[in-house]
Structures are given as structure tokens and as C-alpha cells.
Swiss-Prot record:
This is Mitosis initiation protein fs(1)Ya. Its main location: nucleus. The modification Phosphothreonine is found at T478, T484, T489. A motif (Nuclear localization signal) lies at residues 512-520, 534-538. It comes from Drosophila melanogaster (Fruit fly).
Amino acid sequence: MSFSNVLIMRQPDEGKCHICKRVFCCGKCRQKHQFKAHAIAVREPLGLRSAGGGIIEHRHQMESGATTIYVFCPICERRPLLLREEMHGELLAHIETCHLPLRCRKCQRNYTRVDDLREFSKCVDQQQSCTDVTGATETSKATLKKAANSTAISTQTSPSVTPISLINMRWKAKSRVTHEEFISDSVSSIRNLSSFSNSSIRRSIGQLGVNPSETMEKGKVIRSTSTPLHVESVFAKPKEPITFNASTGGHVSSIYHEEPSPTPESNPVQQQQQQQQPLQQRAWKMGARNKMSAATPLRQVMSKSIQKAFVEHGGMMVHQPPSAVVQRRVRLDLSEHSSHEAAGSSALDLRLSPAMRRTQSESSASEVNSGSSSSYSTSRNADLCKRQFLLSAQKLTTESIIITRTNSSSQKTSSTVYNSCESVEIIRSTSESAEVCHVPAITPIRVTGAGINKKQIKFETPPKSSQQMRSNGEGDETKDQFFTPEPGTPEIPERRHRQAIVPRQLSGEFSPKKDKPKEKGLAVMALISPPLQQPRVRPPLRECRQQRVYSGVQDVGEPEVVDAEEEDEVFRPTNASTCNDKKLEAPNSGRLWSLMSSMMRLPASLRGEREKDRDRDRDSDKENAGSGSLIRRCASIAGSLVRPSARDSSMEDQQCLKRKRTQTLDSQYCSPLSPSSSSKRYRIRPREPIERMRRQ
């Protein structure tokens, strides 16, 4: 900040010109500047007071000794011009030259001539006189901005009263009254009016409109504050129906809204008690709504389950009798003598889920009287029978789910009715045919058309005795019933559909010496004969060491006679699609390709022996002559593809040691159309150069 700016800030207002805002060194220099540049010399003084008119006459004594009267234009000084009957001619000439046209702030009248300023009339706005005129011209720099069309009072007529816009005040007060009538008991609304009642608001509005002078003395300013004022806790207010407006749906009722009674007629004794009940209310009940709203406001954050509970719990207000409107209030007195007076149900408890309500009502009783209207009017025993409608927050169904449970306790009978829709006719039709019946506790009934709740689905595991009976063949009629199996129950062999795994070995040189012609015969029979449909039991792993070891998946054959002790272990692939494809393919083509792939995988040392065994089996099998020719043709093709190579014993031992690493239980399934990866490695094995030159 520079030094010159500091000097300007420290200078008082007496060094600044009031019109052009120029700054001078002192007040005398500023006064000389104003009288020389901005003052209007007046010939005849009018004797106007400075407090009354706003135009101040300044007497300036010249150096020659003569006294001159000067007047400053209020418009140039950015002050309102008050029109009077007597005005200086020099001032009017200055206004005509510099400031015309003018517009009144109150009545928005335009003054375009000086004669209009002389022959003016009082502008009347809401019975208040206004003679303020401001300038709005573009030729002068000292003109004021055009005032907006507002109703604000320009000047403060009294130091004790704040200027208030009367129209805005009326509109705000009227809107508050209308708003209070509609949502007076809303859960999410809090009144911010500081007035004591609606009548005081209307009285203050009337006083403001009729006589403003009396309003300044007697009327009270209505204002809204940011702090909630609980006026109703001190002063009693009339009872009003409770509504709930903090939801998106139109059918949502209040928490304390009660179910309408299905019987339109009521006991006359109860009507008399209901008429006397408002007189017996205590004074502290008046502030019940404010206390409850402070506890749970329940705005727009309600879950869908709570909204459904509101829809099920509260009915429409149209179906209620006039006597039930008085009952829709906040009941803070929950004593026993006043609870049975109401014809509806108790308040909905949102803390309990439907499962908890069913658990708590295990020991409750059900009694539905067929002549409900006659019993209400004739006997007083209906007061002892309290009907509680516990409404579940489940999905709405097309029918009514009514579950009755019976229990007698202290000569009082209460019924629990689970009602999922507002169907009074179904309840009436059920109540006419139903009597007091003792039924054991049951699970909620599955109604046609109702959505299944995930929490209601219950899986049960059958006992072991039923499983043993089913295994013996006694439970054939219940095969379609499925249950969740127990983890400790042993599995039944007939239900096992798991396919086993084939122990794979590349060659049969390291397998134990067995009857190889018999093995080859079984392999050929498995390729020709159709496969068996019955799955077999997998033996324990300890017995696998005593079984045969085969060179490939396709070389394994299944015997025709199945014996649990003597049959060879064959592990099938676990993929169901491959099993189905294997069954659906043609017998000759599938066997042909499987035989070709098996022959291509066989080592060269066993090829000649396998050809002899296949020729011997072909002679012994007369009915399968066609397939035998295919086998012989396939063997010739495989012999042309797999070329024998002369190896010494050292090379064979080294190859055997290398092949031992691939002996494993492989769970993957090899397609018969493509050879395995191990056979590919054997075929692409490089040959010695001397053998290659000899064959070429």
C-alpha cells in the first residue's frame, strides 16, 4: 500500500465533495469548491427548515460583505427530492435543465415538465402518502438508477418501527397459514412461526390492512426463525388427524394410522366412551407430535420394506366411519382399560420382521365369530376378545393368507390374523365357516399366485432310516422328492455317476507279464461290441496296483460279464458331453479311428506281435468278418505310418527310463480323432543319420 493511499484513507469526509466526490485538503477548500461549482444562487429565501423540506439554504458571506443564499440540488447529492408547493424557481430551472424526466418511487408516475412538479398530487399507495421523487436521466452523471417496481417504503417514518413491505408481509403470512393447515402434523415438518395461534396471525394481518397507525402500536411483527419453537407444548392446540407426507406413494399412511374395522356398526357404549375420551386427555398429551417427530423423523430414507408395511398396515381414509376419525391420534396412554376401547388394531411395530412375528405368535389363539355385527351390539363379551391384526411386510398377494393358532390363557382369547392384502370379503367368508379349532403350529401356507420369499424356503434332510428304506426298494414312489443331503450320510452306489480316471502308460513293456493274447482279445471285443450302459463301482486305490495297466485309453475293453471281484478297472472320462458323443457316433467309424490311433501309439517292438494276435482273433470271430477286414486294413495303415527302428538294449533302457516319468493318473480325455501328445513326441523323435540314409 502506497503512502498516498494511506493519506486518502485517513482523510475525513469533510474533505470530500458531496456531489462530485472530489477530495480536498480540508473542509474549507471543499466548501469553496461546492459553492463555486455546484451551488445555486437564490434571490428570495423561502424560510424553509432544514428538517422539514430537505432543501437547505446556505448563507454565504462574500468578501465584499454581501450575503448570498445558496441552495444545493438534492438530486445531485443523491437524495430524494420532496415536492412542495413553494419551491425556488432557480432550483426548478436546474431540474428542468439537468434532471427531467423524473419518476416517483411510490406511484411510478413520470414527470416530464416543470409544470407537473408545481401542480402535483399526493401519490397514494396502501393509504400512505408519498411525495418522494427521484431523478432518472442519462444526461447527468449525478442521476440515480431507475428504481424497480417494488413496494418498499423509501423513508423511515418512525425511528421505532422498521419499514416493512405490507404486500409481501400479507403474502408470507397467508402462505404460512395455508401451509400449516395442510401439514400441521407431518412427521418431517416443524413449525417456525413465533405466533401463538392462527387467530393472532389473521388479527395482525387485519390490523395492518385496516389502520396502519394502530398497527404500529398494537400489531406484532410476524417473522420466521431458524430455531424450531415448540409453542404447542405450552398452549393446547385442537386435535387434528395425523397424516404422513414423507413418502413417494399416495397410499402410505401414518405410523399411528389404524386399520379400519370390517364391521361398520359399533357398540353405543363405546361411542359414548369415545365422546368422553377427548375430555379426559391430559395436558401433556398436547405436545406429543413434537416429541415423536424428534424421535424418528422418517423422511425420504425409508426402505421398501417399511413402505410396504405402511401400505399393508393403513387403509384408505374414505372407508372409516366418522367415529374412527377421532381415534386417529397419538396414544401415549397405553393402559389396559383404554386399549380395548379402540375398534382398530395396535400400532405397527417396524422393529419386528415377519419371521419374528410368527415366532412370537406361536402360542396365540384364533377365534372368528360368524355373527360379528350382532355380537357387538348385544353382548359385552366382545370387549374381552381383543383382535390384533399383525400385518406382515411381505409381498402383496392376490389372496389372503390366514394362519390360525390356538391357545387358552387366563380365560381370554386373542386371534392372530396374517393379512397380506386388503381383502375384507375373504376374511368375512372365512370367518363364517371357521369355528374355534385347535390346530398345531404350522408353517405359512403357499398361496397360488403369491411370490415365494427367500427367507421362507426351508430345506430338510430325511433321516437315515428313510434313506435305507429307499435303498432297499421300498420308496420307489418317492423318487421325485429331492432333499439336501447330509454331509455324514454315506453315498449309495446306485446314485454314483462319477466317471473314473484311466491310468495311462505309453507301452506295455513295464507292466507285469500276463496273458497278452487274452488282453488283445478283450481290446478288440471292446472296440467291436457296443458299450455297456451300466456304470460300475470304483474299487479302492490299493487294489489298483493289482489290476492291469494299459497303454492307452482306447485299448481298454470292458468284459461282457460284469463281476465285482474279477473285472478290470476302467476309468471313464468325467465329461458328460464326451460320453454322449461317444454313444451317438457310428460303431464302425468310432472303432476304426480308435484302432488307428491305438496302433499309431504302439511301439515298434510290439507291432508284429499285435498284428498276429489280431489275425488270430479275426479267424476266431466269424460273425464280425466285415469289421475284421477293417481292423486288418487299419493295421496295415498303422504299420506304414509307424516305421520300426533297430535299437540296442542300452537305447531301450534309456528310453524306458525316460518314459517312466509320464506314467500318471491323467484326468484329461483324449479324443479318438487326434493322437495324444505323448505319441506325437514319439513320432517326431529324430532318427539317426545312417538309418535315414539307408531308408532313402
